[in-house]
Amino acid sequence: PVSYVDISNDGIDDLIVDQGVQRCEKSWSIFAGGTGGNNFIFFINPTIDNVKAWDGSGFGGDKENKIFSMLIRSYEIVKWKSKNALKVQVHGVSCNVSGAIGCYNILVASEKGIKKVEGPTPNPQ
């Protein structure tokens, strides 16, 4: 799915694309991901120009156009220091627990990028 939510806390909705739900006729598994999750793309303060600048064949994003990409299992919007932040679920290898337990990181977004402010922390068992 595609979500619009202000994760950069500047009053402008940002665009989040979960590539795990995309399909390709010639390769059904290309977007399927794995135990570590799948690719999510974050467009900070998107405009028509920077959305059009996105190159789907690239990996890692495009900082100049405020496009950031990461491999995660899922995300939710949480409050961190009274502002919107991302709580992202990642594979357990990030915090020395099993993949099934997994970990989370807290990230804050701005036009400069997405920065980890907490984690990785093992999920409660």
Stretches found by the model and what they are:
Residues 19-23, 44-48, 89-96:
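Short, flexible beta-strand-to-coil junctions
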Residues 7-20, 81-91:
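Acidic/hydrophobic-patterned starts of short beta strands in beta-sheet-rich repeat architectures
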Residues 4-10, 32-33:
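Short secondary-structure boundary/capping segments within folded domains
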Residues 25-57, 105-112:
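Beta-propeller blade repeat segments, especially FG-GAP/WD-type strand-to-loop junctions
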Residues 64-125:
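Acidic, small-residue rich beta-repeat scaffolds with periodic aromatic anchors
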Residues 60:
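Surface loop/turn signatures of beta-propeller and other carbohydrate-active proteins
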